[in-house]
């Protein structure tokens, strides 16, 4: 019998926090799941950590370095469940996450993409802030034209919706989640649970200046594509201005623009 949930996690040289991430999944009270961990060419102690688990629900896929987007798609193609959940290898799923999300999706069959709030923590696990995302489908759609309203590590998606839109776009090394949400918005309703059900770890090197520029270019491409496809109405072309302006701003000023877009 297939599990209820397939959890997909990609890891590259993640020995520092991997054990905490894996155990936060294996310890979920709703235990009817499989955990697929894609070891994306790690050269540290990642393989040894994963080899130490003897839980039949954990499957490890090892591959040469291919990048996050390719790794996630490889994991999704191996999933057996009708619900696919994400968790990054340095984040933590809080104990009631799966139970709360499955209960909501059972009660709302029209919802194909469900996220949650999160607690942002520093590398030592100290609390930085709590993020409460927009909750209802209409709110999320209004936000989606401006910024990414989902915590990637918190999402649970119906697999049939993923199949309809073709998984992550492997030509995008960054912002692949934002692109996927835009495409999913055309085939399914969306929701966020306001409760923080994930710890999202923020590390100093998460967004380098070069990576931030790459992300802005990807955001611009995604929004242009959404306008062309009809996912966004024509008036939303105004939201192309934010990434275009950010690309010509000094890096130190980009954060101000990003916060302004989120406040909307």
Predicted segment positions?
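Cell-envelope/extracellular polymer assembly enzymes that use nucleotide-activated donors
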Residues: 3-6, 34, 179
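Glycine-rich, basic loop-to-helix element that forms the pyrophosphate-binding segment
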Residues: 63-79, 100
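Short aromatic/hydrophobic "clamp" motif used to bind/position activated sugar donors
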Residues: 84
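Conserved nucleotide-sugar donor-binding catalytic segment
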Residues: 77, 116, 130-220
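Short, acidic, metal-binding catalytic loop of nucleotide-sugar glycosyltransferases
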Residues: 23-32
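Conserved donor NDP-sugar-binding/catalytic core segment of glycosyltransferases
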Residues: 96-128
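A conserved acidic beta->alpha catalytic loop
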Residues: 24, 39-48, 66, 88
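Acidic helix N-cap motif at the loop->helix transition within catalytic regions
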Residues: 16-19, 44-52, 92, 96
């Amino acid at each position: 019998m297939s599990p209820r949930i397939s959890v997909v996690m990609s890891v590259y040289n993640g020995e520092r926090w991997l054990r905490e991430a894996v155990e936060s999944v294996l310890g979920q009270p709703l235990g009817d799941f499989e955990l697929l961990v894609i070891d994306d060419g790690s050269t540290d102690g990642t393989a040894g950590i994963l080899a130490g688990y003897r839980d039949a629900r954990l499957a490890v896929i090892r591959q040469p370095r291919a990048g996050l987007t390719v790794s996630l798609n490889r994991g999704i193609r191996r999933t057996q469940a009708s619900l696919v959940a994400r968790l990054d290898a340095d984040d933590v799923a809080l104990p009631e996450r799966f139970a709360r999300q499955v209960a909501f999706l059972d009660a709302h069959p029209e919802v194909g993409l469900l996220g949650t709030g999160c607690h942002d923590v520093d590398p030592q696990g100290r609390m930085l802030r709590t993020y409460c995302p927009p909750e209802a489908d209409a709110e999320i759609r209004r936000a989606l034209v401006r910024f990414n309203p989902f915590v990637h590590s918190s999402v649970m998606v119906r697999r049939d919706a993923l199949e309809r839109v073709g998984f992550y776009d492997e030509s995008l090394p960054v912002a692949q989640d934002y692109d996927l949400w835009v495409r999913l918005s055309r085939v399914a309703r969306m929701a966020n649970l306001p409760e923080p059900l994930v710890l999202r770890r923020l590390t100093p090197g998460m967004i380098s200046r070069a990576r931030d520029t790459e992300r802005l270019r990807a955001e611009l491409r995604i929004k242009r594509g959404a306008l062309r496809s009809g996912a966004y109405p024509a008036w939303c072309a105004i939201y192309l201005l934010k990434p275009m302006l950010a690309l010509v701003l000094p890096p130190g000023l980009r954060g101000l623009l990003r916060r302004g877009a989120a406040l909307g």
